């Protein structure tokens, strides 16, 4: 099958059915008609020359801000990409949007703004692309919600687009010489150091050393946490050039990617490849397979469902379960494993893992990518994983025979829940509930020593869902504190909120319906027995139907926490977690 035929047959949604002849097919509406003279006058003011008005315009958007290591370098990458675009004979139109640092806001009310920043990013990219008639888009994200945000926008505006991932951070190194601290540390080490400190495993000097050196410079949090999970998913989907997700932020490869992006996007435009040609059901199945095989974040469930929705593709948590049932966990990445993303490029990068999965018949090979190659064609060009490498385990000897992402249903979550269960803490848990109305109350109880080793406890943190919190904040601070305190095998953690990609332990989140909507999680009381059976995808509250009916009758919906501003709007519009928390369902 020829390339043009592949593009045409893969195209499901675009209004154009042939390879683009006119590369400025949108911007010409502004730059060419004499009746748009005022528009052209405005462009002259920005530095346009006469010859620029015929050039295709590429919106180069970054999620830059200086206050976060994930994003602090993105303006530099934007400038570099823009220079490359100009050299390719195109016109770079630079713009920027906001971000939220989960690592900084974690454990505070600021985390309520995190998930809704995904929608702001998607809306802002869609808005400027459509309003300013840009012909193509280079998106430069780096922190957790950045990647799904820009991908959602691509699905909406459906103009030739390439994502340039900001890149992963390098590991940090402690300096105090303590044998209790790993030689390679990262942001999760800093979170866990608090639990280790309050349990007297760490001295104050050791805790301070971890905090000071966990993040050595620019780049996204280093393990297979949410940012690296979603960057990898974007690459498997086909929205990046090869190995964009595995080039570290501080690397010559990342700079070379930016320096060559002009020719890449020009080729994408010439071939007429649009995001919805790439974002097919088969491509999403590939992305899910990769996420499961490499131990990716539970947030991938929310985000990939939302990205699929933007492209008109029906995807649900049940698709994750179907794929997880037959996909072994083979990536030995933090938080539950040993390695960080910066290690992967040393064994061939994301493309080598794709090649391994494809050669073992685990991926669809006919999906399209931004370079015009199919996934299979890219895989054939990629190097094989070197013999003896230990980051990706052989399929014959996996870390876990099936996936770590488990979709659970039962009397506690009739609309579904997402479990992150690697098997290290087991696959079955039965314990008595200890209920907290917000995460801060749990941290205080832990500090007081109320959560005890040897007692099988199911910690329930509720009213943290998309509408109830609002914003469905992540529970990395509680999960890290539990692990740091050494309670990973004694405590299961349940919430209608989310978990960070850096979380590990016996964790169940995304519980639907959430407490604020009258879901069963809102009716749990201290001492209730709860069973989590990951092998059978069940999560049940062992309380009689009669008792639950009585509790439901006396339940009163809490008043909204916000009645003005962005979170108030979000709470009114957001769909449930099983539908991706989209606002336009």
UniProtKB/Swiss-Prot annotation:
Induction: Expression is significantly repressed when the pH changes from pH 5.0 to 3.0. It comes from Saccharomyces cerevisiae (strain ATCC 204508 / S288c). GO terms for cellular component: mitochondrion. Its main location: mitochondrion. It catalyses: (2R)-2,3-dihydroxy-3-methylbutanoate = 3-methyl-2-oxobutanoate + H2O; (2R,3R)-2,3-dihydroxy-3-methylpentanoate = (S)-3-methyl-2-oxopentanoate + H2O. Dihydroxyacid dehydratase that catalyzes the third step in the common pathway leading to biosynthesis of branched-chain amino acids. Catalyzes the dehydration of (2R,3R)-2,3-dihydroxy-3-methylpentanoate (2,3-dihydroxy-3-methylvalerate) into 2-oxo-3-methylpentanoate (2-oxo-3-methylvalerate) and of (2R)-2,3-dihydroxy-3-methylbutanoate (2,3-dihydroxyisovalerate) into 2-oxo-3-methylbutanoate (2-oxoisovalerate), the penultimate precursor to L-isoleucine and L-valine, respectively. Catalytic activity is inactivated under iron-limiting conditions. Pathway: Amino-acid biosynthesis; L-isoleucine biosynthesis; L-isoleucine from 2-oxobutanoate: step 3/4; Amino-acid biosynthesis; L-valine biosynthesis; L-valine from pyruvate: step 3/4. Its cofactor is [2Fe-2S] cluster; Mg(2+). It holds the Pfam family ILV_EDD_C. This is Dihydroxy-acid dehydratase, mitochondrial. The branched chain alcohol isobutanol exhibits superior physicochemical properties as an alternative biofuel. Overexpression of isobutanol pathway enzymes such as ILV3 can enhance production of alcohol precursors and are of great interest for biofuel production. The active site is at 500 (proton acceptor). The keyword Transcription does not apply. PANTHER family: DIHYDROXY-ACID DEHYDRATASE DAD (PTHR21000), DIHYDROXY-ACID DEHYDRATASE, MITOCHONDRIAL (PTHR21000:SF5). It is found in: Mitochondrion. GO terms for molecular function: 2 iron, 2 sulfur cluster binding; dihydroxy-acid dehydratase activity; metal ion binding. Coiled coil: none annotated. Belongs to the IlvD/Edd family. Disruption phenotype: Strongly reduces the iron responsiveness of expression of LEU1 by affecting the synthesis of alpha-isopropylmalate. GO terms for biological process: branched-chain amino acid biosynthetic process; isoleucine biosynthetic process; L-valine biosynthetic process. Its EC number is 4.2.1.9. Present with 171000 molecules/cell in log phase SD medium.
